[in-house]
């Protein structure tokens, strides 16, 4: 029986095999959805592991069946939790879509940092849709409730901060999902996709450019309420690219350069910080990721030239 069950966890070539595998994983998701509906506080913990189910399903089935799975599994989960649909909309459905996309892009060998970025944006969009669906269903806008409790009605920035927080949540959640999914896929002897130096140079370049834009917003040269969103995206690419710098010992002058730029960043923030516009002034904090990205880029170039 064990060997017969394990036959499902391989690339499916027949319609029967594909549908059987997707049916099993849809049923598993339905069970977890019911647990979340009856015990809502489990939604956060399950939210980290639910994408794994869809990722495995999408990895092993033929790609033409993935849209069918995403729609079918979502409708099944909504159907079995009709009495408490909030957590299903906000946690389960995004997990189905993000996990399926992860499995698809994993099979296509798309680099992890771009895989995570795309899925994070999808997660973010689905969270926003779920937020407005909950308002339509319940008639309660939780954001307005929180804003009223904190006496922030006079603030024009609370919506952009909410969007930035939701985007940050999506990046953090997707990053944890990635670690969990990769850890499990390795158990199935699926080859890990390695990030080369060129991919890291692309990430650090994106972080550097977005960081400069954030800094210009912070000192008032560019005026835009989108600064917190740009800052969050910049921070993601900075983190995804600069781990190269600390993966092994680099030449001493690299760390000296990093220390000098970090100290210079402190002085820059202290000089240009504006109390009258604290939200945009937070863009000045991009000096630190920009310094890190620049030094990482230089370190990669130095390493390639030395080879």
Task: Briefly describe each language-model feature range.
Residues 2-69, 112:
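Hydrophobic transmembrane alpha-helices
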Residues 3-8, 238-307:
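Long, positively charged, glycine-interspersed low-complexity recognition regions
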Residues 30-34, 74-80, 123-129, 212-216, ...:
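Aromatic-anchored segments of alpha-helical transmembrane domains
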Residues 115-211, 216-227:
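Membrane-embedded alpha-helical hairpins and interfacial helices in multi-pass inner-membrane proteins
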Residues 43-105:
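Alpha-helical membrane segments and adjacent membrane-interface helices in multi-pass membrane proteins
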Residues 18-31, 70-73, 203-214, 262:
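Alpha-helical transmembrane segments
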Residues 67-76, 115-124, 232, 253-265:
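Central hydrophobic cores of alpha-helical transmembrane segments
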Residues 9-11, 23-26, 92-132:
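Short helix-perturbing small/polar motifs within transmembrane alpha-helices
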């Amino acid at each position: 029986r064990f060997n017969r069950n394990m036959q499902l966890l391989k690339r499916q070539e027949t319609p029967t095999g594909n549908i059987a595998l997707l049916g099993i994983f849809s049923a598993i998701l339905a069970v977890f959805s019911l647990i979340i509906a009856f015990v809502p506080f489990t939604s956060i913990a399950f939210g980290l592991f639910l994408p794994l189910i869809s990722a495995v399903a999408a990895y092993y089935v033929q790609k033409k069946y993935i849209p069918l799975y995403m729609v079918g599994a979502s409708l099944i989960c909504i159907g079995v939790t009709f009495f408490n649909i909030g957590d299903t909309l906000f946690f389960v459905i995004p997990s189905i879509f993000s996990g399926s996309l992860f499995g698809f892009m994993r099979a296509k060998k798309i680099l992890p940092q771009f895989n995570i970025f795309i899925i994070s944006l999808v997660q973010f969009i689905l969270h926003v849709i779920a937020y407005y669906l909950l308002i339509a269903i319940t008639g309660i806008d939780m954001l307005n409730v929180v804003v009223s409790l904190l006496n922030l009605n006079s603030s024009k920035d609370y919506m952009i901060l909410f969007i930035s927080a939701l985007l940050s949540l999506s990046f953090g959640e997707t990053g944890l999902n990635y670690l969990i999914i990769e850890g499990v896929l390795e158990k199935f002897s699926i080859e890990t996709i390695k990030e080369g130096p060129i991919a890291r140079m692309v990430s650090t370049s994106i972080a550097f450019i977005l960081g400069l834009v954030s800094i210009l917003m912070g000192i008032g040269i560019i005026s835009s309420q989108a600064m917190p969103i740009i800052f969050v995206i910049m921070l993601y690419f900075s983190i995804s690219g600069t781990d190269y710098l600390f993966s092994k010992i680099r030449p001493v002058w690299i760390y000296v350069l990093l220390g000098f730029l970090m100290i210079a960043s402190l002085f820059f923030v202290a000089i240009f910080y504006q109390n009258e516009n604290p939200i945009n002034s937070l863009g000045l904090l991009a000096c630190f990721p920009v310094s890190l990205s620049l030094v990482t880029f230089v370190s990669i170039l130095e390493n390639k030239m030395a080879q």
